[in-house]
Amino acid sequence: MGKLTLLLLAILVWLQYSLWFGKNGIHDYTRVNNDVAAQQATNAKLKARNDQLFAEIDDLNGGQEALEERARNELSMTRPGETFYRLVPDASKRAQSAGQNNR
């Protein structure tokens, strides 16, 4: 009876070792689970970005307001008869904001 008990104990130890430390064991499972969670978070961020880009594309395809807004903001374009004014902060405020941005 003693040899059978030792054999079963050895098999149990071997199975536990392979469960915890072997290939596809608990450690591999937790590592893969963490990798999947990180990838899902990245995918969620990218999906939100894609949704935003698709909304912008739809807006640009659908109407003139988005094109006009973009032309005014990025290219400083104006309509005939309009005057474009750009407000530039004075030097002390620019130095303060530059100092805060460098932190």
UniProtKB/Swiss-Prot annotation:
The keyword Chloroplast does not apply. Residues 1-3 are cytoplasmic. Residues 31-71 form a coiled coil. It is found in: Cell inner membrane. Keywords: Cell cycle, Cell division, Cell inner membrane, Cell membrane, Coiled coil, Membrane, Transmembrane, Transmembrane helix. GO terms for cellular component: cell division site; cell septum; plasma membrane. The keyword Cell cycle applies. It is a single-pass type II membrane protein. The chain crosses the membrane at residues 4-21. GO terms for biological process: FtsZ-dependent cytokinesis. InterPro entries: Cell_div_FtsB, FtsL/DivIC. Residues 22-103 are periplasmic. Pfam families: DivIC. Belongs to the FtsB family. Part of a complex composed of FtsB, FtsL and FtsQ. Essential cell division protein. May link together the upstream cell division proteins, which are predominantly cytoplasmic, with the downstream cell division proteins, which are predominantly periplasmic. This is Cell division protein FtsB. It comes from Escherichia coli O1:K1 / APEC.
